[in-house]
Amino acid sequence: MKFKTYAWIAIFIVLLAVPVPAQKKVKESQLGQKYRDWLTLVTYIILPQEKDVFLQLQSDFDRDIFIDSFWKQRDPTPGTPENEYRDEINKRFLYVNKEFAKDTPRPGWMTDRGRIYMIMGEPQGRDKIGNLPELHPCELWSYYGDVSLGQPTYFGLIFFRRQGIGEYTLYSPTGDGPKSLVVFSPNLGFNVDSISDVVQYIR
């Protein structure tokens, strides 16, 4: 039985690495609840080609083996009973659905903060700004980046309540601009057209 399991894992790896004729995909809505829940859990970490392969599988047996292989390939300590990465993803999922669903009707994992938390994990720094009359409520998250993945050594993300209401959304320097963070006032002590000035004021 163990040999058969390993053989199936090897087949899935080959399917991911080599182009094969596409088989008819199963719609997510046609999957059992267990597999729909799993796809929700791994939404932000599963590769597009992995998801394609998963949706081409025609039996729950194959899906179970695929899921087992998915986690094993990401296990930082293979050969041990624990899979720290899988446990961490489950932990993050529980956290975001509890913490980030408080100000929105959507599940926490669907929010911008939930998405970033699922991908990046807990930020090294998290500053909540809600008591400055010049600024809309916002949060500044900071991370140490992984240079091997092309990330800067240190970077920050801003989440803010657009117009001061609703859920926190990820700030975009190009799409939003610094003024979107600011409550209009003619006597501000910083340049509202400079994101560096606004961030410096937050800090």
Spans of features found by a protein language model:
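Bacterial N-terminal signal peptides
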Residues: W8-A17
